[in-house]
A protein has these predicted regions:
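Second-shell loop/turn segments in exported
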Residues: 1, 11-12, 43-45, 77-87, ...
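Structured beta-strand-rich core segments of catalytic domains in phosphoester-bond hydrolases
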Residues: 2-65, 71-73
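Metal-dependent phosphoesterases centered on the DNase I-like endonuclease/exonuclease/phosphatase
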Residues: 86-172
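Short flexible/disordered coil segments
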Residues: 40-50, 70-77, 127-133, 167-172
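Extracytoplasmic/secreted cell-surface and envelope-processing proteins
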Residues: 18-21, 77-80, 119-124
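Flexible glycine/proline-enriched surface loops and loop-helix/loop-strand junctions
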Residues: 53, 74-79, 151-154
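N-terminal start-of-chain detector that recognizes signal peptides
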Residues: 29-32, 39-42, 83-84, 139-145
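Metal-dependent phosphoester/phosphodiester hydrolase catalytic core
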Residues: 62-92, 96
């Protein structure tokens, strides 16, 4: 049944040592790809460290131009204190790309999504990516994270040590 739908994929190989990449699966009947690019996340303190690229796909959905960024931030391996700065680097890359889009296209429709390995209330998401959980708190440079309200209700996408995390997010 999937083959009949003619789904397509946008994908780039990333430098991740485990071979994990991100991609965007789409139906060309509804979404037309105009351009795509991959952005590396580098660690200035460790030139040998590698993680997944972040994917930017610009296209048309129902005749409207949209930008979709797909990310899979570094894991929490080694604990939050050790691994948090790596996710902050990933968030900074995402935010930099978003800022570039907004500078060129102030009314851009942007979707930032993926497995962030952090919750909606973590600093990497709130501070580095500059997201807020309530529409009324939106300011010119902020993104809206609808997943924050789910998280605050105890809804998650990952159970770990008898608690829910909401790492899989869609931010607009």
């Amino acid at each position: 049944k999937l083959k009949a739908r003619n789904y397509q994929i946008v994908h780039y190989e990333s430098p991740d040592k485990r071979g994990i990449d991100v991609g965007l699966l789409y139906n060309p009947k509804y979404f037309k790809v105009l351009s795509s690019s991959a952005y590396e996340v580098n660690n200035p303190e460790d030139s040998t460290w590698r993680t997944r690229n972040q994917l930017l796909v610009t296209g048309e959905l129902n005749g409207e131009r949209i930008h979709v960024m797909v990310a899979h931030w570094p894991s929490r391996r080694g604990g939050q204190k050790k691994s948090g700065p790596k996710r902050a680097l990933a968030a900074d890359v995402g935010r930099s790309v978003i800022d570039s889009i907004i500078k060129a296209e102030p009314m851009a429709k942007i979707f930032y999504l993926g497995d962030l390995n952090d919750d909606p209330i973590d600093d990497s998401v709130r501070e580095n990516l500059k997201s807020v959980g309530k529409v009324e708190k939106l300011e010119e440079d902020k993104l809206f994270n609808p997943m924050e309200s789910f998280y605050k209700k105890g809804i998650g996408t990952l159970g770990y040590r008898d608690a829910w995390n909401l790492f899989d997010q869609i931010i607009v």
